[in-house]
Amino acid sequence: MDVEVNYSHAYLLAEDDDCYPDGMLDDSPTHPVGIIRVEKGIAFLITGLHTGTVSFTVAVADQDPGADLEGYEDIVEISFESPSAYISLYEAGGAGVHGIPSLSAGPGTYRFRYHARGMDAAREENFSDVVIDHYLLQIWPALHSDPVVLKSTSSYFRYWLSAG
């Protein structure tokens, strides 16, 4: 799906959470992953493009679908606590809302694996209505575990990783 971003982000909200994030959520203090930050019912997804159109794919599965290590430059994982089986992808500022398949195990703990491709090229362009960067968010039920960086290639990802 094409998603409009402003200020290099989009976010997920659980259906019963009507509060948009006030600003950037904090990264995990013990295991930073840079480009995704979570609190209960909210996930803040950082993109390379500052303003314009990015490509998002969200895949909800019953079990770990496996990372796409060849197709993406940067890949991170983090646990997410959802108070609802229903979440949506919101464009920055709530301008647009994209439905996502319901979470297979209902409310509970899930693993998010966030893949990114083209962040450096998108950051150089900064503004674009043509898709430059692509994102895949895989979601499946899992016990809580520490955040982890599976693959780190882009300099923009490394910037966010060090920004904490």
Question: Which residues does each PLM region occupy?
Answer:
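Short connector loops at helix/strand junctions that flank enzyme active sites
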Residues: 40, 53, 84, 107-109
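Internal, hydrophobic beta-strand segments that form the core of beta-sheet-rich folds
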Residues: 106-120, 133
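Primarily secretory-pathway and cell-envelope proteins
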Residues: 1-71, 120-164
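Extended, solvent-exposed segments with strong compositional bias
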Residues: 69-106
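Generic secondary-structure microfeatures
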Residues: 47-49, 60-64, 80-84, 91-93, ...
